[in-house]
Amino acid sequence: MSEHDMQNTNPPLPPLPPEITQLLSGLDAAQWAWLSGYAWAKAGNGASAGLPALQTALPAAEPFSVTVLSASQTGNAKSVADKASDSLEAAGIQVRRAELKDYKAKNIADERRLLLVTSTQGEGEPPEEAVVLHKLLNGKKAPKLDKLQFAVLGLGDSSYPNFCRAGKDFDRRFEELGAKRLLERVDADLDFAAAADGWTGRIVARLKEEAAKNRATPAPQTTPPAGLQTAPDGRYCKADPFPAALLANQKITARQSDKDVRHIEIDLSGSDLHYLPGDALGVWFDNDPALVREILDLLGIDPATEIQAGGKTLPVASALLSHFELTQNTPAFVKGYAPFADDDELDRIAADNAVLQGFVQSTPIADVLHRFPAKLTAEQFAGLLRPLAPRLYSISSSQAEVGDEVHLTVGAVRFEHEGRARAGGASGFLADRLEEDGTVRVFVERNDGFRLPEDSRKPIVMIGSGTGVAPFRAFVQQRAAENAEGKNWLIFGNPHFARDFLYQTEWQQFAKDGFLHRYDFAWSRDQEEKIYVQDKIREQAEGLWQWLQEGAHIYVCGDAAKMAKDVEAALLDVIIGAGHLDEEGAEEYLDMLREEKRYQRDVY
C-alpha cells in the first residue's frame, strides 16, 4: 500500500486538547525521543515493549510565580525584598527569592516576572552584588527581555546627587530591552519604610490580578511572619539595638597627622551578638548638644517647646538631640526651608538642581540658618528634617581573637565652614563625646558579600586605603586564629608612613608570625611624586597574576568615588598585561571573579 493510500484510508485525527498541547510544548529532545518510542509501542501492542522508564516526568503546567531579587549594600534592600516575598507568599503567589550575589546574570533572559529592590552606592553605581547584571544589561551581549514583566524599587539618599541612580538605570534598561512594567518605579529615601510598604502592597495586588488572568492555582495561603524588624533568633537588631559599653578610644594617627583616626573597642558582653569578618557594626548616636543649642538659638525657639518625635511628645531640644538628622543636609531641607527664609539667593539655589546639589554637599544645616535667617516654629523646623539614621562601620576585629568585644576603626570627620568648626554626627559622638564605660547602642549588620574564602588554604589579596584597612585587620586575625594555610597579601595606602600607618606594630607582628606573607605600602605624600595603592598594584602585576592563577581572592575596601574605581582600572591593566587578554577579555575575567566571589568590594 502506498503512502498516499495509507493517508486516504486512515480517519482524520481529532485535534489535541489544549492542555496536552501545553504539556508537549515544554518537552526537551530526550523526552520527545522517549515519548515517541513509548507511543509507538503502545500503538503496536498496548504495552511499553520493555522501554526503560524516563526519570524526568512530563512537565506540569508552569505555576504562576515571580522572582524577587535584591541588590543591597547595607542590608536595607535585602530586608525590603524579604518582606515583599513574605507578603507575596501570604497572598498565595509562588516566589523565587535570591540576592544578586547568588544569581547568575544570564538567567535574566529566562525570567517572566521579576521584582528588583536595589540600593545605590558611590556616585550612582549599583551595589557590588549587582555589578555583573548591570554590565550585562548595558553591554553588547544584553539579552532581549520582551517576555519579561518587571517592577523596580530603588533605595537611596536624597542628599547625594545621583539619588536612586541604580534603580533608575535598571528600570530604564529593562524597558529598553523590551520588558513591560508591572508598576512604575518607586524611589525611596533613607526613611524608606512607608514607600517600600506602599510599593509592596501595590505589587501584591497587581500580581494577584495577573495570577487570576492566568487562571493559575495559587499556592496555599500562609500567615506572614511577625516582627520582621527583629532578627529571627531574637538577637538585638537595628530596631532594638544593644546598649553596649565603650571600652577604649585610642587615637592611632600621629599628632602631626591631618587625619584623626580612632581605634574603638566596645563590650558586647551579655548581648549574644555574633559577627564574622567582613560584617559592619551599626551605631546609633546622639547629636552634639552644642549644635542643638546653636540651631535653636538661630531659630529663636525655646528648647522646652514640645513637639512630636518618635511617637512621643518631647521637648524640642531632646527631639533634635536623638531623633533628627542635623549633620547631613539634603535638597529636600533646602527646598522646604527656602520659603521661610524669603531670600532671592536661596530661592535661586533651590530652583537649580545642579547648584542645589553642590550647595547641599558643602553647607551644613546650621550654616544654612546662619546664612539665610528665618523664623519657624519648632514643629515646622522638625518637619523639614529627616529621622536620625545609624551609621555603619566596618568591623576591624575577629571574635575568634577578641571574644565579646567588637573593634572599629573610625575616621573622625572634622572641618570648618565659614570659620565655624563642624564634625560628623556619629564619628564626633564616638571620638569626642562618648566617655569610657559610656553607653552606645549597636547592632550587627551582616555583609555576606565580603567574606573570607570557605577554603582557608586559598590566598587572599587585601587592598585598602585609610580606614579601609579595618576589615583586613579582622581578616588576618581570623586567619591567624585558625592557623590558616592560605597566604595573605596586604596592599595599603595613606598619606605618610610616620603619621598614618594604621596598626603598624600589628602588621609587623603578623608578618613575623607568618600570617602576612606579602605587603606593599603606598605613602602618597612622602615623596614628590604621589604614590597610591593602584600604582602598587600595577608595580606588582606579575605577582598578582600568579596569585590569581593560584586561586586568590581579591578584596577592596575604601572610597567608592575615587579609590575603588582606580583600583579596578589597575586590576584590569594587570589582567591585560600579565594575563595577555584584550580589554573585553579582561572585563569578562573580572566578571568571572565576581561571580565566583573571588573579587569582593566593600566601598562607601
From Swiss-Prot:
Catalysed reactions listed for this entry: hydrogen sulfide + 3 NADP(+) + 3 H2O = sulfite + 3 NADPH + 4 H(+)
Under which EC number(s) is this enzyme classified?
A: 1.8.1.2
- Pathway where it operates: Sulfur metabolism; hydrogen sulfide biosynthesis; hydrogen sulfide from sulfite (NADPH route): step 1/1
Q: Give me the stretches of Low complexity compositional bias.
A: 216-231
**Superkingdom of this protein's organism:** Bacteria
Q: Name one GO biological process term.
A: sulfate assimilation
Provide the residue positions that the database annotates as binding NADP(+): S524, R525, K530, I531, Y532, V533, Q534, D566
The note describing how and how many cofactors are bound reads:
Binds 1 FAD per subunit. Binds 1 FMN per subunit.
Please give the Gene Ontology molecular function terms for this protein.
flavin adenine dinucleotide binding; FMN binding; sulfite reductase (NADPH) activity
Q: Which Pfam families match?
A: FAD_binding_1, Flavodoxin_1, NAD_binding_1
Q: Which residues bind FAD?
A: T327, Q361, R391, L392, Y393, S394, T409, V410, G411, G424, G425, A426, S427, Y604
List of residues binding FMN:
72-77, 119-122, 155-164
Report the family membership.
Belongs to the NADPH-dependent sulphite reductase flavoprotein subunit CysJ family. In the N-terminal section; belongs to the flavodoxin family.
Per its UniProt record, what NCBIfam families does this chain match?
A: cysJ
Q: What is this protein called?
A: Sulfite reductase [NADPH] flavoprotein alpha-component
Q: Which organism is it from?
A: Neisseria meningitidis serogroup C / serotype 2a (strain ATCC 700532 / DSM 15464 / FAM18)
